[in-house]
């Protein structure tokens, strides 16, 4: 089943559930009421669009989308080209520069190249109101992303989950450590990065774990031109 399962199956199943219909109706009603909701409707499910279920190698869990203009586009930690790199991603790049030989910090925060190589960049909550962090928490998204993680946990093997910060680590408690690899560190936010995110070497460790399974490593270098 795992080879043939797709996000269309997983998400299609959830769309039949009352809780998820309510979540989608809530988000749509907020947009209809004139509130600015990020990311745009066309981008909400981009994490699944760019990384098919059977192609996932690595899962990075974020919290909720960036809530400033033109930032969020459906991939956690990533921002659209032309937007200033947010502080957490600055620290991710700082760690990559220490961890991966030859890594050059790009002048942008666009991580689509990671997604296209099998890195699922998944926020726990997939929408947010402009300027209001966590405004769409507890509206059903957490249940949906629990089901997503559960599907990966049950139907895939040897995935590498990068859980940064207590929120992601709590979310990842269900992951079967016998089937998958779980790497944990503090969140890359400026508030906590110096408590152990910087120096965690998760990117080189991820590639070592992939290569040990005979799987191609991730090229963590985003294009220097956005």
Swiss-Prot record:
Compartments reported by the entry: Cytoplasm
Look up keyword Transmembrane helix and say if it applies.
no
- Respond yes or no to whether keyword Cytoplasm is given for this record: yes
A biological process (GO) of this protein is: base-excision repair, AP site formation via deaminated base removal
**Which EC numbers does the record give?**
3.2.2.27
Sorted alphabetically, which SMART domains does this protein's record hold? UDG, UreE_C
User: Catalytic center at which residues?
Assistant: 64
Per its UniProt record, what CDD domains does this chain match? UDG-F1-like (cd10027)
**A GO molecular function held by the record:** uracil DNA N-glycosylase activity
PROSITE patterns in the record: U_DNA_GLYCOSYLASE
One Pfam family per UniProt: UDG
UniProtKB keywords: Cytoplasm, DNA damage, DNA repair, Hydrolase
May I have one GO cellular component term?
cytoplasm
Swiss-Prot/TrEMBL catalytic activity: Hydrolyzes single-stranded DNA or mismatched double-stranded DNA and polynucleotides, releasing free uracil
UniProt family annotation: Belongs to the uracil-DNA glycosylase (UDG) superfamily. UNG family.
Q: What does this protein do?
A: Excises uracil residues from the DNA which can arise as a result of misincorporation of dUMP residues by DNA polymerase or due to deamination of cytosine.
Protein name (Swiss-Prot/TrEMBL): Uracil-DNA glycosylase
- Organism, as annotated: Vibrio cholerae serotype O1 (strain ATCC 39315 / El Tor Inaba N16961)
